[in-house]
Amino acid sequence: MTTPFSSHGLLLLVGLCCLLLITKTKHEKLYEDPSIDPFQCRKVALTICNVSITLFKKMAQLSGNGNILFSPIRVIAAISMLSLGSNGNLSKHILETLRFNKTGLPEAEIHKCFWYLLHSIHQTEETSSLQTGSSVFIHQDLTSVDKFVKGVKELYHSDMISINFTDSSQAKTQINNYVMEISQKAIVNIVKNLESDTFLAVVNYIIWNAKLDSNFGCRSVKVKDYHLGYGMTIKVPMIHNMAMHYLFRVGDLSSTVLMLTLLTGNFATYFIIPDPGKMQKVEQSLTYPHFRRMRRQLLTRLVDLEIPELSLSETHDLESMMSLLGITYVFNSGTNSSDMNDTLQKSFKVVSKAVLTIDEKGSKPSTNSCFKKLGSTDMGRMQLNRPFLIFIQDHTNDVPLFLGRVVNPQN
């Protein structure tokens, strides 16, 4: 009599396990590296959160009343990556400006933690509709950059591509074509211009196409008014959704906060809706500890929600962001003497793109009876029909994925 799990099946299973062990990548082995402490790496994630909010405040002061959107993990990772190619003084300057010295971790451990945090994000891509990537393009004639190349590939989940920067126009085309291909045409013409003496280009992106679900299947989409401010109103698709959400009041921010967990992906999405006329105050008062306190106070409740469909996209040259953070010199021939800095004496380009869309899950709208039935119960009500702030982080390691201000949800 043959058992349900035969000896042939057992041998096949053993063979597959051996094959998996043999074909483990370096990245998988690094993920199991006992020297990587997830608890310590959460300190790095926390630091990224704090630094990104500081950066957001400075961007808000300079941007007027428009949208702001960037990916903290992608922006800070790109800047931290540059320290791999720097001598001790410059590397220290970059990491201290990013406040990583306050984690108490050695430089090597900080870079390992970036690998760990980025790896955790990449693992969610198949189930979360999240797409992210990083590529470094370096001039083909450069030498003495082995440490930089090795670190970029192994620690920052980045492709390393050697190209000829002599013809900057052709180099720009090659970079844009490569990124368009690896992003499956989701990212087009990410680099707008290159200086003629460019030797290095760092390009990264993050895309999240989120879908809003409902515990009860109560959802529909209607075109309604959205108030931009200053007496201006536009028509936008508004998702009407009844579901269990987190809705609470933050008094010292003069704001109502909605946290959604019913979006695709293991992410926490915070919408901070300032009271009328309080946006500027909220932006300058916001700190990351606010979010930590919010999470401790979360209580779920039935919410009658109207939220605009979002279609947001912004591209940032990181040189200006580094300046806002206080990183005043990178690869400057007058201040560095390492092999990398002796070689890299020209211009460099660092670009980060963030794309965020949120729409309704499924194409079949709910019937009015669904809303009427649930509408008879005690519930919170929230209309996101005016500008708000948005902050998105993963639940596993608290990595900040997106941070921004939404004035026009269809920009």
From Swiss-Prot:
UniProt site (Reactive bond) = 376-377
**Tissue specificity note:** Expressed predominantly in epididymis where it is found in the epithelial cells of the caput, corpus and cauda epididymis.
- As given in the record, the signal peptide range reads 1-25
Task: Say yes or no: keyword Secreted present.
Answer: yes
**Which positions does UniProt annotate with glycan attachment?**
50, 89, 101, 164
What the entry lists under SMART domains is as follows: SERPIN (SM00093)
Q: What is known of its domains?
A: The reactive center loop (RCL) extends out from the body of the protein and directs binding to the target protease. The protease cleaves the serpin at the reactive site within the RCL, establishing a covalent linkage between the carboxyl group of the serpin reactive site and the serine hydroxyl of the protease. The resulting inactive serpin-protease complex is highly stable. Variability within the reactive center loop (RCL) sequences of Serpina1-related genes may determine target protease specificity.
Membership in a protein family: Belongs to the serpin family.
**What PROSITE patterns would the database entry show?**
SERPIN
Q: Which organism is it from?
A: Mus musculus
Transmembrane residue ranges: none
- List the record's Gene Ontology CC terms alphabetically: extracellular space
Name-wise, this protein is Alpha-1-antitrypsin 1-6
The role this protein plays is: Inhibitor of serine proteases.
Q: Which UniProt keywords apply?
A: Glycoprotein, Protease inhibitor, Secreted, Serine protease inhibitor, Signal
Chain's gene name: Serpina1f
